[in-house]
Amino acid sequence: MKLTTIPNEFKEAAPVIREINAQGFEAYFVGGSVRDALLNKPIHDVDIATSAYPEEIKQIFKRTVDVGIEHGTVLVLMEDQQYEVTTFRTESTYQDFRRPDEVTFVRSLKEDLKRRDFTINALALDSTGEIIDLFDGIEDLTNQTIRAVGNPHERFHEDALRMMRGLRFASQLDFKIEEKTLAAIAEFHPLLEKISVERITIEFVKMLLGVNRQGGLAPFIETECYQYCPKLREQGAGLFRLMDLPARQIETEAEAWTLLIQSLNLPEAEIRSFLKAWKLSNQLIQNVSQLVRGLRFRLSNDWQPMMLYELGEESAVLVERLLYYYQQESQVQVTKELVKALPIHQRHELAITGKDLLAVLEETPGKWLGELIAEIEQHVVEGSLENKQEVLLSFAKKQRSKGEKA
């Protein structure tokens, strides 16, 4: 089979392959880029596999960088582009179920392709657009099937993360996992405990953001892979609730975590530790915590000025978008107007500062100062105090006077 239209990404990288070919070696585009080209999807990373050994590649090209030479990968720099070129290889046993104990360079494309995870990723493409399909990957693409290359038991024992990748592809591509491959995932899912949380998180998030997350979540639950993901062991019912939400694709990672937490009915006090267990960044944890708080408020209330102020426009709009999943009408434009109409949007917009209060009240700093500023801030946001210096200072004097009498 030949590609009728060769994507620009391949055209730009073709000189690398032609140069390797000119020196008597084989070279092909491989992996996800070939799959995505056949599916007419955007191509991200172009990977090249070759029969040339790393030292031979370094002799062919003037500008190279050793980025993973022990695994056969050399970065080739050509004009303003860079391409990863990896030698055909076979791999030995995998003691940690993730990385091979030993890599052996070979001259055979077939030996290289048969160690790959799924047939749809075991495709190669030469510089003329001719596709090399040794494991019926094109047929599986046509039938929208995710099938392990060769024996699925061996593939998942080599690299346990492949199970999560299979579930992710089911969601991303809207494909079905082939029966024997699915059975092997169900059998070997305990091996996921050998995989780092960070790697599991990447695949899990991609699964939630896929075009058919239900198509990934259903086998994720069925095979019990969730039991080896952070803090999900006892959360089967919550995952079913997540799966039952309307099918519209989730747009951002923060929204995905928010919908998951809401489906799990996590108490507010447990949200931070749950997200930390997934090794998320502090910024993302903060954003998601805000979104959950806003969503839970909005599901049973109209917006209140203080809640909008604390969330800010971006988070408030995301909350409105999330209402769709709970059969409530989203009012994005109204929400934007409500936020815009707030008297202030950040504390520094207050007409007074802590220094002003200390000067006028002639007091030393203490806990009282932060509490008083917060009280003033709330009154201004809610419209019960005008944001003018004299008004706010007068209010502050009255409040301190009350405090002294008390």
Curated annotation (Swiss-Prot):
Lineage: Bacteria, Bacillati, Bacillota, Bacilli, Lactobacillales
PANTHER family: CCA TRNA NUCLEOTIDYLTRANSFERASE 1, MITOCHONDRIAL (PTHR46173:SF1)
Name this protein carries in UniProt: CCA-adding enzyme
Recorded catalytic activity of this chain's protein: a tRNA precursor + 2 CTP + ATP = a tRNA with a 3' CCA end + 3 diphosphate; a tRNA with a 3' CCA end + 2 CTP + ATP = a tRNA with a 3' CCACCA end + 3 diphosphate
Gene3D superfamilies (UniProt xref): 1.10.110.30, 1.10.246.80, 1.20.58.560, Beta Polymerase, domain 2 (3.30.460.10)
CDD domains: NT_ClassII-CCAase
NCBIfam families (alphabetical): PRK13299.1
Co-factor requirement: Mg(2+)
Keywords linked to the UniProt accession: ATP-binding, Magnesium, Metal-binding, Nucleotide-binding, Nucleotidyltransferase, RNA repair, RNA-binding, Transferase, tRNA processing
Pfam families: PolyA_pol (PF01743), PolyA_pol_RNAbd (PF12627), tRNA_NucTran2_2 (PF13735)
SUPFAM superfamilies tied to this protein: Nucleotidyltransferase (SSF81301), Poly A polymerase C-terminal region-like (SSF81891)
Function summary: Catalyzes the addition and repair of the essential 3'-terminal CCA sequence in tRNAs without using a nucleic acid template. Adds these three nucleotides in the order of C, C, and A to the tRNA nucleotide-73, using CTP and ATP as substrates and producing inorganic pyrophosphate. tRNA 3'-terminal CCA addition is required both for tRNA processing and repair. Also involved in tRNA surveillance by mediating tandem CCA addition to generate a CCACCA at the 3' terminus of unstable tRNAs. While stable tRNAs receive only 3'-terminal CCA, unstable tRNAs are marked with CCACCA and rapidly degraded.
Any Gene Ontology biological process: tRNA 3'-terminal CCA addition
GO molecular function, one term: ATP binding
Residues at which Mg(2+) binds: D45, D47
Subunit composition and interactions: Homodimer.
EC number(s) on file: 2.7.7.72
Native source species: Enterococcus faecalis (strain ATCC 700802 / V583)
Family: Belongs to the tRNA nucleotidyltransferase/poly(A) polymerase family. Bacterial CCA-adding enzyme type 3 subfamily.
Chain positions recorded as ATP binding sites: G32, R35, R116, D159, R162, R165, R168
